[in-house]
């Protein structure tokens, strides 16, 4: 489910797909001596020097770099006013408006060079200049366009990006000249690092400011269920007077980006709601996976339908556990639920903890991940060596499967609860739609 771009290779690869190498970049070579010591200080000299050499070569040539390559070179050469003009030309050439999805990946660089230009023109700090650039750019964007563009402002792992730049420099060692295509690649990597390390300390606050202008955000709604439990929800509403339908996800996963997920729904004209399994996040109750999600989703849907901002219609969507909870809600047939859009839904009792009388250990650690606290136990769950070898340890122990947690050394009470129901019995059937429930289904799926 991890949807935010955190891997440096992904960031660079996606940005590169927007750009096209031209004949100039393919045909020419440029002098470059890779520094003997590859560190930030040496690259801060070598890469801008390389960028200026490429620009000088272009001035001497009858050919021109494609604008999609040129602005990377100009950023690396610290020619930010030129880079801003080139980016605007690139947008115009391709028909990419400020709000277009195809041009969204360039927004961080565009804001960076615009801010650097303001620094030079107005003699202000970069922080003040970037705030002005950000506000000027986003003020005129509609909610969907702003959401798309802000998705590119999350800081990627800069240390990994620096290591990848260093590796790219090492690959061209031992030669006095490199192709312009290689030069563009080095400058592109360098420009991304320069951009993100400058803007990363500023973007969270600015994104929060913009969101507050667009939406009413309740990051900690608490809803009582009929049996006295409390479930927690994130609610994001567009700042409009009209009553709106609600797009709901119900999940056990307390990922940091669930707020962004609710904002995405609000950006598309819905009230965005993410509800959480009882016991998760700020719910004071014990964590209960699967068993109460249908009842609790129904309670949340009914609560939503009574709110003054709701038009009485709720649709659910999502995958994996979030897909299961839709079928769990359908079993209880809340009147306000008008559609579900599940994909790749989890189905407890099939595959967890066994399939066709064969016990599976693939999800053995999952109960710890989701029930060890209000959030997610990433540390324990990511102990890959422990979980990947547990199956063999149990097999070699000769002990019955019900004692696998004793082999591991950490009690797994949810597993013990589940293996008491090896068949798809009433325990599992009570959790989600099955059998005659499908015949009663009267909403689009």
List PLM regions with ranges:
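Glycine-rich nucleophile elbow surrounding the catalytic serine of serine-hydrolase chemistry
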Residues: 318-328
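N-terminal cap/lid segment of alpha/beta-hydrolase-fold proteins
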Residues: 201-242
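Bacterial N-terminal signal peptides
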Residues: 9-22
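Cap/lid segment of the alpha/beta-hydrolase catalytic domain
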Residues: 238-305
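Alpha/beta-hydrolase fold nucleophile elbow
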Residues: 308-320
């Amino acid at each position: 489910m991890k949807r935010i771009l955190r891997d440096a290779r992904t960031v660079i690869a996606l940005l590169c797909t927007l750009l096209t190498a031209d004949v100039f970049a393919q045909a020419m070579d440029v002098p470059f001596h890779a520094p003997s010591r590859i560190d930030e200080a040496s690259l801060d000299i070598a890469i801008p020097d390389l960028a200026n050499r490429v620009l000088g070569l272009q001035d001497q040539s009858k050919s021109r770099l494609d604008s999609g390559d040129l602005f990377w070179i100009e950023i690396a050469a610290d020619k930010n006013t030129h880079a801003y003009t080139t980016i605007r030309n690139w947008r115009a050439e391709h028909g990419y408006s400020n709000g277009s999805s195809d041009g969204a990946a360039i927004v961080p660089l565009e804001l960076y060079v615009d801010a650097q230009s303001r620094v030079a023109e107005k003699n202000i700090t970069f922080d003040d200049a970037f705030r002005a650039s950000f506000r000027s750019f986003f003020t005129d964007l509609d909610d969907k366009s702003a959401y798309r563009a802000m998705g590119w402002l999350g800081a990627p792992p800069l240390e990994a990006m620096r290591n990848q730049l260093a590796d790219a420099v090492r690959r061209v060692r031992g030669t006095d000249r490199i192709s312009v295509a290689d030069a563009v690649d080095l400058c592109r990597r360098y420009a991304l690092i320069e951009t993100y390390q400058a803007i990363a300390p500023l973007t969270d606050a600015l994104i929060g400011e913009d969101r507050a202008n667009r939406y009413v955000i309740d990051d900690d709604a608490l809803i009582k269920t009929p049996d006295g439990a409390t479930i927690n929800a994130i609610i994001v509403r567009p700042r409009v007077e009209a009553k709106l339908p609600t797009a709901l996800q119900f999940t056990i996963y307390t990922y940091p980006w669930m707020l962004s997920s609710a904002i995405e729904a609000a950006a598309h004209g819905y009230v965005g709601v993410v509800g959480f399994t009882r016991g998760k996040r700020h719910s004071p109750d014990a964590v209960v996976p699967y068993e109460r999600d249908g009842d609790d989703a129904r309670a949340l849907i009914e609560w939503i339908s009574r709110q003054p901002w709701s038009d009485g219609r709720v649709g659910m969507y999502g995958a994996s556990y979030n897909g299961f909870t839709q079928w769990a809600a359908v079993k209880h047939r809340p009147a306000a639920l008008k559609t579900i859009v599940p994909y790749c839904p989890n189905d407890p009792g099939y595959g967890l903890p066994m399939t066709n009388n064969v016990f599976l250990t693939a999800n053995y650690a999952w109960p710890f991940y989701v029930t060890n606290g209000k959030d997610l136990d990433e540390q324990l769950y990511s102990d890959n060596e422990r979980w990947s070898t547990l199956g063999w340890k149990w097999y070699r122990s000769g002990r019955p499967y019900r004692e696998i947690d004793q082999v591991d050394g950490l009690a797994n009470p949810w597993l013990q609860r589940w293996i008491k129901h090896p068949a798809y019995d009433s325990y599992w059937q009570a959790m989600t739609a099955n059998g005659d429930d499908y015949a009663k289904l009267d909403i689009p799926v």
